Amino acid sequence: MSFKDRLFICSQYLLPHHLLSRLIGFAADCRATWFKDRLIAWFARRYQVDMREAQVEDLQAYEHFNAFFTRALKDGARPLAQEPGAVLCPADGAISQLGPIEHGRIFQAKGHSYSLAELLGGDAELAAPFMGGDFATVYLSPRDYHRVHMPLAGTLREMVYVPGRLFSVNQTTAENVPELFARNERVVCLFDTERGPMAVVLVGAMIVASIETVWAGLVTPPKRELKTFRYDEAARAPIRLEKGAELGRFKLGSTAIVLFGPQQVAFNDGLGAASPVRMGECLALPKQS
């Protein structure tokens, strides 16, 4: 590891993650024209954001930076894979890792893995259906579309807010911060689907000011304590989302992790670590029994 990388990793442990993220979140919601127009223009230029696919192409039309960052796309900008039974990629970005969940652990990077149960908030019962299953981790870069969509149609069963740190998420931290995704703040969404249980985990990172879902709105930051929301109780109307429907969004970005049970899906042979992906592309197909 280079000296520069060592310095970066050391800074990750010393910086006040949540304070920085809250301050940046405040700036991202600022509506002052002189400020938000300059910030949006700089960001779009710095990260070469393609506005031609956005519903609103005019950078100055966004009321604040977060509205720009979570911008909607034009109809048809992300066609859904048409293969029978296709499991869709949930977000734009790049595959960080994908593969089997082995011995209750998920591969993070060379020399590092993390606990499935810890990812889901330390609940062994929640983790049980995914033991021996499969996972895919999608990293959303700053230039990407930052809404997360359903890989399969599903009925929401449970949502868990898991407090944690806000380490930056990139290749350097993945290779050098142990249990990165099981340490960062995250929102776990559990669904019942035609392929059995499915989890979509929205993982925060440094400067991720908040995570939203379409059914609950703003999920973070509440009080920093684990909180479970159940949606399969008789008193609640079922929440069902169709394949490709929006699930949630990052106000400033990070990572989406999708989990499936054993013998349910076979990942697209063309995908591997660092493969670029777009929401709606075929991530996997049903595994033949």
Swiss-Prot record:
Looking at the UniProt record, the site noted as Cleavage (non-hydrolytic) sits at G253, S254
- Keywords from the UniProt entry: Cell membrane, Decarboxylase, Lipid biosynthesis, Lipid metabolism, Lyase, Membrane, Phospholipid biosynthesis, Phospholipid metabolism, Pyruvate, Zymogen
Question: What's a GO biological-process term for it?
Answer: phosphatidylethanolamine biosynthetic process
Name the top EC class.
Answer: lyase
Nucleotidyltransferase listed as a keyword: no
Q: Does the keyword Lipid metabolism apply?
A: yes
Q: What is its EC number?
A: 4.1.1.65
Cofactor binding, note field: Binds 1 pyruvoyl group covalently per subunit.
Its UniProt pathway annotation is: Phospholipid metabolism; phosphatidylethanolamine biosynthesis; phosphatidylethanolamine from CDP-diacylglycerol: step 2/2
* Entry membrane topology: Peripheral membrane protein
- UniProt xrefs under InterPro entries: PS_Dcarbxylase (IPR003817), PSD-B (IPR033177), PSD_type1_pro (IPR033178)
Q: Name one GO cellular component term.
A: plasma membrane
Functional description taken from the UniProt entry: Catalyzes the formation of phosphatidylethanolamine (PtdEtn) from phosphatidylserine (PtdSer).
How is this protein organized at the quaternary level?
A: Heterodimer of a large membrane-associated beta subunit and a small pyruvoyl-containing alpha subunit.
* Record's protein name: Phosphatidylserine decarboxylase proenzyme
Originating organism? Pseudomonas aeruginosa (strain LESB58)
